[in-house]
């Protein structure tokens, strides 16, 4: 996944106790998470309860996170990779194996979801589910109707066919700046395997995206949240919860902007974001304390309410705001889930092909 890049937030610093001439050592924790992906009070509430100061940085693509991890000196105690990147990072030795004796609230997690995640993390040995969601189309109802008329917004054709994009360009279109999100969607739209290894398939997806490239206002994986909410763009390829946040911001602003989200009828990506402890973490015990804190139903319920993403704890759903817990955009019905695909761990050769293809699409070279 997702999910605005900001400066490091030093949250809820507490005065350290002085014992005679010796100052007690501060307990600290360094977290690297997706943009707009936690409730406003979560960190300060944790600090108040635990006495652990939290330093919090954000990113908006798995590629950015991977760059930190590959260096071997991430500087973080908790990071939040998506499921399709997790397997590769585990194989590279990027994470510590979990000590589940330090996670008493592990019992609160959904066993069925844990089983799904074993594709990337056999035995659930390295990562803890945080939130999950889908990719789809976020759009400004009035502006899109203005340029497309009564055409239903229910297909990837809205974004992947030039005749539609040419019209939408008048009010602004945002695509994610992430080949591992955009290319599988185009492959799936073409009826091809979104996890294909075949270069010929990627060539077909490249052709689709290259044809609509002239009509894309920009490529960014989080800017579209505020731009949808403000009416600066009318449509975006986006994460479900990010569009939910845009809709909430638009409603709060009271300017009559109605933002909706749709999972196209052809299907879309179902993804999971997970908490993991980097191999070079210096405060692993504090990381366990925070992860276990987030495994409390009442804590993760507030996070889901704020960010608009589903969580992995069944006991949290009754505690959530009905507008979130009952939303089919957040918790899709089974008929929709059946059409979704989960991104697989791809070999390095295919990932390089994805990267080269995406660079050509973006630059037109």
Curated annotation (Swiss-Prot):
Top-level lineage group? Bacteria
**PANTHER family, per this entry?**
NORSPERMIDINE SENSOR, SPERMIDINE/PUTRESCINE-BINDING PERIPLASMIC PROTEIN
Free-text function comment from the UniProt entry: Spermidine-binding protein probably required for its uptake into cells. Binds spermidine with high affinity (KD=14.3 nM). Does not bind putrescine, cadaverine or spermine. Spermidine binding induces large inter-domain conformational changes. Implicated in induction of type 3 secretion systems (T3SS), which play a role in virulence.
Q: Which family does it belong to?
A: Belongs to the bacterial solute-binding protein PotD/PotF family.
Which residues does the record give as spermidine binding sites? Answer: 35, 181, 242, 269
Q: Which GO terms describe its cellular component?
A: extracellular space; periplasmic space
Disruption-associated phenotype: Significant decrease in T3SS induction.
Record protein name field? Spermidine-binding periplasmic protein SpuE
Position of the signal peptide: 1-24
Q: Establish whether keyword S-adenosyl-L-methionine is in the entry.
A: no
Location(s) in or outside the cell: Periplasm
Alphabetically sorted, this entry's keywords are: Periplasm, Signal, Transport, Virulence
**Quick check: keyword Transport in the entry?**
yes
- GO terms (BP aspect): polyamine transport
Gene3D superfamilies xrefs: Periplasmic binding protein-like II
Molecular-function annotations in GO: spermidine binding
């Amino acid at each position: 996944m997702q999910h605005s890049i900001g400066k490091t937030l030093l949250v809820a610093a507490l005065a350290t106790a002085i014992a005679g001439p010796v100052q007690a050592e501060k307990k600290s924790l360094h977290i690297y998470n997706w943009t707009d992906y936690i409730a406003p009070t979560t960190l300060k509430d944790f600090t108040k309860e635990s006495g652990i100061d939290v330093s919090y940085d954000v990113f908006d693509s798995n590629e950015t996170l991977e760059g930190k991890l590959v260096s071997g000196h991430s500087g973080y105690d908790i990071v939040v990779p998506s499921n399709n990147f997790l397997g590769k990072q585990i194989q590279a030795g990027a994470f510590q194996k979990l000590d589940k004796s330090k996670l008493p609230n592990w019992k609160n997690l959904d066993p069925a979801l844990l089983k799904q995640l074993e594709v990337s993390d056999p035995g659930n040995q390295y990562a803890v589910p945080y939130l999950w969601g889908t990719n789809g189309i976020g759009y400004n109802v009035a502006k899109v109707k203005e340029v497309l008329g009564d055409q239903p917004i229910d297909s990837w054709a809205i974004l992947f066919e030039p005749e539609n994009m040419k019209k939408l360009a008048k009010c602004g279109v945002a695509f994610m700046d992430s080949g591992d999100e955009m290319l599988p969607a185009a492959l799936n739209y073409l009826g091809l395997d979104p996890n294909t290894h075949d270069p010929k398939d990627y060539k077909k997806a490249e052709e689709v995206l290259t044809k609509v490239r002239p009509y894309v206002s920009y490529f960014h994986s989080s800017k579209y949240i505020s731009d949808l909410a403000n009416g600066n763009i009318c449509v975006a390829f986006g994460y479900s919860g990010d569009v939910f946040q845009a809709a909430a911001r638009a409603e709060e602003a009271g300017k009559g902007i109605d933002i909706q989200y749709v999972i196209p009828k052809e299907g879309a990506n179902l993804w999971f974001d997970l908490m993991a402890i980097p191999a070079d973490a210096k405060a692993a015990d504090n990381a366990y304390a925070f992860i276990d804190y987030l495994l409390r139903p009442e804590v993760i319920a507030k996070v889901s309410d704020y960010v608009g993403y589903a969580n992995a704890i069944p006991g949290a759903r009754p505690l959530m705001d009905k507008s979130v817990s009952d939303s089919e955009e957040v918790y899709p019905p089974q008929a929709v889930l059946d059409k979704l695909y989960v991104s697989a761990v791809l070999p390095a050769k295919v990932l390089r092909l994805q990267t080269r293809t995406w660079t050509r699409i973006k630059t037109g070279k």
